[in-house]
Amino acid sequence: MQAEFRRAKNSPQFFFSNAGMEEGNCREVAENCKKNLCSRGKSFTIVKGQSAGRNQVLGGRKRMSYVDEVLEKVVAKNPAEPEFHQAVKEVLESLRVVIEANEDKYRKEALLERLVEPERQIKFRVPWVDDAGQVQVNTGYRVQFNSAIGPYKGGLRLHPSVNLGIIKFLGFEQVFKNSLTGLPIGGGKGGSDFDPKGKSDREVMAFCQSFMTELCKYIGADTDVPAGDIGTGAREIGYLFGQYKRIKGLYEGVLTGKGLTYGGSLARTEATGYGLLYLTEEMLKINGKDIKGKTVAISGSGNVAIYATEKAQELGAKVVTASDSTGWVYDPEGIDVAALKEIKEVNRARLTEYKKYRPNSEYHEGRGVWSVKVDIALPCATQNELHLEDAKMLVENGCFAVAEGANMPTTLEATEYLQEKGVLFAPGKAANAGGVATSALEMSQNSERLSWTFEEVDARLKRIMVNICHNMADAAERYGMAGNYVAGANIAGFEKVVNAMEAQGIV
């Protein structure tokens, strides 16, 4: 006979079961295992559980853990959707300690099965006529994932890579991101394989009008409120809103990211970058540090990076880097935000131009933005831009905090390394939630037929980001994972959605 042991991922709890073994002997072995692990710098508590591993021993036969059972079902049911598989796996694995504490209850209610299955998946054709008079046909999608805490909310992505699996992956992530804001918004996502690049304004308008002609049947200010995303900017939102109003005869807040002349919100452009700094500042405060006087490396030179740089310098930090697809800039005196805006927003030029404004700066081709000695790193450029080697350089150079401004800019290996080395790490679903939070504030203004000042929106945004920071910190601490903000963000988002689902019954 032997006991089985397992440490739940991202948890200091060490579960054991005494299958066929006296409990006293089993615990003695468990304590020896604990001593061995603690001698290697690990810290655990011993917890007697019904399950010792992912395969539970029940009545002489093994039963798969609920998390693994659901993961297998997701893959079997959605075989051609690897992005969706990955998203579900990453979230459920980080929630294992929470799910296992309530496994019997969740299994009986099929709660995870309901959580990973969208409430509605809409797929439709989008015919439109190009400038040459040729009819083109694209595919449109809207996945309304979960409305337990409010109307579906999530962007519309226009890119050739878009398919149902990607939209489901994005929609699933959006559920937890929106929940974290504390605002009454559910999760959804949509889009099409249409590529607006290289298309004339007339062609983009033709596509958007055709797309909305079908989509308008499923959305509304209190039902589903789409927004912009990759490929969907102010131009596209305008065309979509115009067609909705034309068909429905309603002037309502059915889309966010609108222009200021027809219901948009002030501070929306700045929201993600400003929100990133509000959360970073609060995370440092919780850990007894101050952002004032710190040096910061920021990647990217788009909206998020520009306004993160602006707010960081307002808070007394010094941002010394910026980057684009061709290279990066190091300015030891601090990035000139006005110059950066002129280069990127006005001239739409490359960062090679920056040296004309700041002769003492350095321009470097290719990668390398994370090689600079800084206190704080804020990746704001693109997915998987910060690799394991970059993380090692940051740690070696004394970086003590990383917060994600882009969506998943840090690889899994880099994230794990940073956490192991004690670097404060704020995941994107929390750190870059300022954009969706301000979209929800736009919905509120539209509902009230009011337009708030920039200062009012900014103050509300700051409160939301500070609350997100405390919610993820508190959730991590409740489950014995103090300082693990990745787990904390997932737990905080999960608990709110699950509690709402349970309260509303089997629907």
Q: Would you name each region that the model predicts?
A:
Residues 2-5, 11, 21-30, 34-37:
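Cationic, amphipathic, low-complexity segments that mediate targeting or membrane/lipid association
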Residues 63-266, 496-506:
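N-terminal ligand-binding/catalytic initiation module
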Residues 65-87, 283, 395-507:
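Adenosine-phosphate binding glycine-rich loop
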Residues 68-72, 89, 164, 168-172, ...:
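Predominant activation on well-ordered alpha-helical scaffold segments within soluble catalytic domains
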Residues 223-227, 250-255, 298, 321-324, ...:
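General beta-strand structural signal in soluble alpha/beta enzymes
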Residues 327-425, 430:
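Rossmann-like adenosine-cofactor binding region
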